[in-house]
From Swiss-Prot:
<feature type="binding site">
    <location>
        <position position="267"/>
    </location>
    <ligand>
        <name>Mg(2+) 1</name>
    </ligand>
</feature>
<feature type="binding site">
    <location>
        <position position="352"/>
    </location>
    <ligand>
        <name>ATP</name>
    </ligand>
</feature>
<feature type="binding site">
    <location>
        <position position="338"/>
    </location>
    <ligand>
        <name>L-glutamate</name>
    </ligand>
</feature>
<comment type="subunit">
    <text>Oligomer of 12 subunits arranged in the form of two hexagons.</text>
</comment>
<keyword id="KW-0479">Metal-binding</keyword>
<feature type="binding site">
    <location>
        <position position="205"/>
    </location>
    <ligand>
        <name>ATP</name>
    </ligand>
</feature>
<dbReference type="Pfam" id="PF03951">
    <property type="entry name" value="Gln-synt_N"/>
</dbReference>
<feature type="domain" description="GS beta-grasp">
    <location>
        <begin position="15"/>
        <end position="96"/>
    </location>
</feature>
<feature type="binding site">
    <location>
        <position position="343"/>
    </location>
    <ligand>
        <name>ATP</name>
    </ligand>
</feature>
<feature type="binding site">
    <location>
        <position position="320"/>
    </location>
    <ligand>
        <name>L-glutamate</name>
    </ligand>
</feature>
<feature type="binding site">
    <location>
        <position position="263"/>
    </location>
    <ligand>
        <name>L-glutamate</name>
    </ligand>
</feature>
<dbReference type="GO" id="GO:0006542">
    <property type="term" value="P:glutamine biosynthetic process"/>
</dbReference>
<feature type="binding site">
    <location>
        <position position="129"/>
    </location>
    <ligand>
        <name>Mg(2+) 1</name>
    </ligand>
</feature>
<feature type="binding site">
    <location>
        <position position="131"/>
    </location>
    <ligand>
        <name>Mg(2+) 2</name>
    </ligand>
</feature>
<dbReference type="InterPro" id="IPR027302">
    <property type="entry name" value="Gln_synth_N_conserv_site"/>
</dbReference>
<feature type="binding site">
    <location>
        <begin position="262"/>
        <end position="263"/>
    </location>
    <ligand>
        <name>L-glutamate</name>
    </ligand>
</feature>
<dbReference type="InterPro" id="IPR027303">
    <property type="entry name" value="Gln_synth_gly_rich_site"/>
</dbReference>
Length: 469
């Protein structure tokens, strides 16, 4: 929105802006903020904050951190009562001035710089498709003597027998793909979200009800360069959640909130360009792919077990990555084939449209880390000319057992991918994009704050299995 400090100050004065919302991303991938009066904001000055209070950042004895504005990300907040401009910031060390190695936005910025330094390409485009659910009510709690969650939706398949306010037209389990209203209860809500996205610079291409019951949705918008695409995804989540909120609903990007129905994925489309020309197209190649594209795929598939530590980084992620729910559990590539983890969309003979789609990721990921890790894996494939296994153009869910045994499968748990990341991370550290400190911090954070607490707690289903044993 702005290119320099003068533009900011002029806009603030001319448009009666009251507040500047200072935003930065924590390590797990949740946007943080604090607000200052617009009249006191100097875009050229650093702002201080306590890094020890942010997940995955600093210890208390070295907690002071500095923020520097990225003015190109400025947007007027559509949800605040008083006129407010949201600006994303980079995090720096207040003493040395160096980029903070655990700042997700800095990592994405370094990934783009590393790409240019390789000479392979100068631009990487990313187009995520983040699915989500819309609910009317959600309750959850864990304590010493109870553990439960309860979700509800007017469109939920479980509400066909509801006594009050029931006019039928519920979305069946796995039956939500494309039915027209009144079965699609949320067409107007998605339209409202789409209009808000367009106002905020995200060009919507299509929106629809997804396969799952209870309002599962997908809204696609135009791709962008790596850092900008990650910023766009954070803005997308913010708008989806807040439009749902002001309509008395609640939206979640949790990968698997409903047992027995499809989870929410985040297919990520990717392409490399050099000097304004696309690098992934070759009309002579399989599915129109160039050697560069094929090697890029080879890098992602080779490093997939460790890569998933960033693209599928939660315990809940692996409730989605199971057979039977259209999840991409087979680590192969194929054209058109949605049962493959790496799909080559049919794009005709237009070189600019040629791209690869990695279907394993989910929207619980931190997009700055996930996109950076995908790029680093792909570049490792290009640099080392890593050939993927032969493409498979048949339904991978229906393979004979002897064929299926030869197909690499996704890891089945968060502990497994963290172990893989511990063993395979050199490709991430090329050019100093990911540091060993960041990788070690990520692994420790996930093991300590997510895996261990879940392992300590009895699951409600265990009572069904074992109470009367």
């Amino acid at each position: 929105m702005f290119q320099n400090a003068d533009e900011v100050q002029k806009y603030v004065a001319d448009n009666d802006v009251k507040f500047i919302d200072v935003r930065f991303c924590d390590l797990p991938g949740v946007m943080q903020h604090f607000t200052i009066p617009a009249a006191t904001f100097d875009p050229a000055e650093e702002l201080a904050f306590d890094g020890s209070s942010i997940r995955g950042f600093q210890a208390i004895h070295e907690s002071d951190m500095a923020l520097r504005a990225d003015l190109s990300t400025a947007r007027v907040d559509p949800f605040r009562r008083d006129k407010t401009i949201n600006i994303n910031f980079f995090i720096h060390d207040p003493i040395t001035g160096e980029q903070y190695s655990r700042d997700p936005r800095n990592i994405a910025k370094k990934a783009e710089a590393y790409l240019a330094s390789t000479g392979i390409a100068d631009t990487a485009y990313f187009g995520p498709e983040a699915e989500f659910y819309v609910f009317d009510n959600v309750r959850f709690q864990t304590s010493a003597n109870e553990s439960f969650y309860h979700i509800d939706s007017e469109a939920g398949a479980w509400n066909t027998g509801a006594v009050e306010n029931n006019r039928g037209y519920k979305v069946r389990y796995k039956g939500g793909y494309f039915p027209a209203p009144p079965v699609d209860h949320f067409a107007d809500l998605r339209a409202e979200i789409s209009l808000e996205l367009d106002k905020n610079g995200l060009q919507v291409e299509r929106q629809h009800h997804e396969v799952g019951t209870a309002g599962q949705a997908e809204i696609n918008y135009k791709f962008n360069t790596l850092l900008a695409a990650a910023d766009d995804l954070m803005l997308f989540k913010y708008i989806v959640k807040n439009v749902a909120w002001r309509n008395g609903k609640t939206a979640t990007f949790m990968p698997k909130p409903i047992f027995g129905d499809n989870g929410s994925g985040m297919h990520v489309h990717q392409s490399l360009w050099q000097g304004g020309s696309p690098l992934f197209y070759d009309e002579q190649g399989y599915a129109g792919l160039s050697d560069t594209a094929r090697y890029y795929i080879g890098g992602i598939l080779k490093h997939a077990p460790s890569l998933l530590a960033f693209t599928n980084p939660t315990v809940n992620s692996y409730h989605r990555l199971v057979p039977g729910f259209e999840a991409p559990v087979n680590m192969v590539y194929s054209q058109r084939n949605r049962s493959a983890a790496m799909r080559i969309p049919i794009t005709g003979s237009n070189p600019k449209a040629k791209r690869v789609e990695f279907r394993a990721p989910d929207p619980s990921s931190n997009p700055y880390l996930a996109f950076s890790a995908l790029l680093m894996a792909g570049l490792d494939g290009v640099k080392n000319k890593i050939e993927p296994a032969e493409p498979i153009d048949k339904d991978l869910y229906e393979l004979a057992p002897e064929e299926h045994a030869n197909v690499q499968q996704v890891p089945t748990s968060l502990p497994a991918v963290l172990d893989a990341l511990e063993a395979d991370n050199e490709y991430l550290q090329a050019g100093g994009v990911f540091t060993s400190d960041l990788i070690e911090t990520w692994i420790d954070y996930k093991r300590t704050n997510e895996i261990a607490p879940i392992q300590l707690r009895p699951h409600p289903h265990e009572f069904e299995l074992y109470f009367d044993i």
